[in-house]
Amino acid sequence: MALLTKSTFLKGHQCHKYIYLDKYYKKEKDPLTEEQRKKYEGGHIVGAMAQHLFRGGLDVSLISKSRDVLVVETKKLIEQGHTILYEATFEFNNVLVMADIIIKDGDEWKIYEIKSSQKISATNRIDAALQYYVINGSGLPIKEFHLSCLNYPRLEVIEMKMEDIPADLFKFEEVTSFCKELLIDTEEKVKDLKTTLALPSIPNIPTGEHCNSPYTCEFIGFCNRPQEEINEGLFS
């Protein structure tokens, strides 16, 4: 089983304490808010719309709930000649990622990461760099890596019917060169986060602005509790 995923990598990029708690103390997470739930649901809807626009693919995630199995199945499907895959799963250096859409172009592949916002953020680019690092490292030849975001407000988009999706629903930004430039930095960050996860105890990092940037941490409630109360909860 992979030690890191795209999700945990981004959490660790935000805060080392965040990734540590997420790995070993999941039960301490704050309850999911209604706003967060709607955002996750909206992301799934937008993802389905992207698959509708890039028709003819096979959704690898439907094959199994085991990510280890999905890595093997992705490799098999590529070897069998499939040219469009959704949620293709790759592992390299004990890091696992799932690519939203991959499309074969000649002997190489174009990767598309779908975002449900109207702007591409710095965090989205870091996300892309990690995916490039893993997919390239796994041996798949990458021709281009694209980030995509919405041309229309998300709340409008998630109310659209599939048959009414406009051809220009998404705008695309190619970030292949950026991802290549960050290969060494990404590998160093992976190494750094693995070191953090090997620590014998929770990193001592105080709360601050980073708790809400770029995303709201899921452990703010835990970190704001008095230290004595935290110790009692962890060791009782």
Where are these regions (language model features)?
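Metal-dependent nuclease catalytic regions and adjoining charged, substrate-binding loops involved
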Residues: 119-122, 134-220, 224-231
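Generic alpha-helix signal with a bias toward terminal, lower-confidence helices
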Residues: 16, 21-25, 31-33, 124-126, ...
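Well-ordered mid-protein domain cores that form the structural environment of catalytic cofactors
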Residues: 67-148, 152-156
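Metal-dependent nuclease catalytic cores that hydrolyze phosphodiester bonds in DNA/RNA
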Residues: 1-108, 231-236
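Sequence-level detector for tyrosine residue identity
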Residues: 18-20, 24-25, 40, 86, ...
